[in-house]
Amino acid sequence: MKSLKAYAQAAHFGPTMLITAISFLLASRLWWEGPAYVIAFTVFLGQLLIGWSNDVYDYQDDLKHNRVNKPLVSGQLKIEKLRRATFILLPFAVIANLLGPLGLKGGAVYLLGVGCGIAYNFYFKFRITSPLVYFIALAALPASIFYAVDRNPPLWVLATSSLLGVAFHFANVLKDLSADRDSKIGGLPQRVGKRTSLIIIAILLIIVITILLNSPISSTFTSDFI
């Protein structure tokens, strides 16, 4: 049981379950609960890949900063085991998403988002273009579910998802700004600092709210299968 909890912590359980829950709600609205459960599971597998690869890559830096809330640092989980689990999971996650209810097109789009998350872990978090992968990945999630039901995702859905993704990126980094700079992590939030990041978050949220208030939400998220 402790081992299972450690794997869950290494997957960044909160964000992972949030994305999984969103995928279930979207799939339930656009399709029905049967495939929605399967879609949520396949999405969950993709989020595990992102979270686990992040903790594997960050292991040395987490040790340096004594982040004992991380299971690899606290000793609850060995890095060899987490690395092995990540590589074992990879083909299953790819196959499940491509051959599951998302279909080839929807599955490929979602896996693009997963790829963006992994690319952030290994490359983009050091670059000024760090928000780009969040912009793409958070749009890929709803887009994949729309494609699964043979519908094109509305532009306003993609826009709000992307902007929320970027806002989350800036918000998520705030608590670790000093440690990140010490570790030479130079994404855009680390470069502009806390005050500017907060301003950017506020602007993005205002734009998102404005778009939502002027969008046909109820008619968009209606299933054709009922």
Name each model feature, range by range:
Residues M1-I226:
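Multi-pass alpha-helical membrane architecture of UbiA-family
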